[in-house]
């Protein structure tokens, strides 16, 4: 596929969030991006590759694919994004642990130790890149849970993870006290997947922007 499409879509989402900040009661300088698994690679790509005006202010990454190094990436993500015969230069460009700078936004990173789909080394090396560049970051590796636990109610560390995430979000000051902290832009969130009365209860509807 065309790897520029998900990147341009995510950049458009960031632009829409910032352009709509007044209407949605958001602080345009306190908007984060969140992604899981392959979506974590997209989120970390936006955090490390985009222009300053489109860059998120923080990133939340659950069991993310970070690297394109074939020795420890998720091969399906590598092949879908870059192709099976990607050059070393292209792999380096999209190995986000190698693209961190001091301008990369702060990060919350979480894995399970027994994740057999995306090796936690992805997040460990990303954390080390952030730490080397003096970017605030936390890395949580829970004892078990495998991969994809973000959508499972039976994840035994669910409450611990939510407490860790809440504490991290509280640990840095929101620039404006009365602003909504996080905006979620994406089909399942904005459209209101699994919400019976989307026209009334979806996020944009509640804010009065539908």
Can you say where each PLM-predicted feature lies in the sequence?
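Catalytic nucleophile-loop/oxyanion-hole region of alpha/beta-hydrolase
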Residues: 1-28, 152-160
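C-terminal catalytic histidine-bearing segment of alpha/beta-hydrolase fold enzymes
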Residues: 124-176
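Short beta-strand/loop motif that positions the catalytic acidic residue
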Residues: 103, 108-111, 115
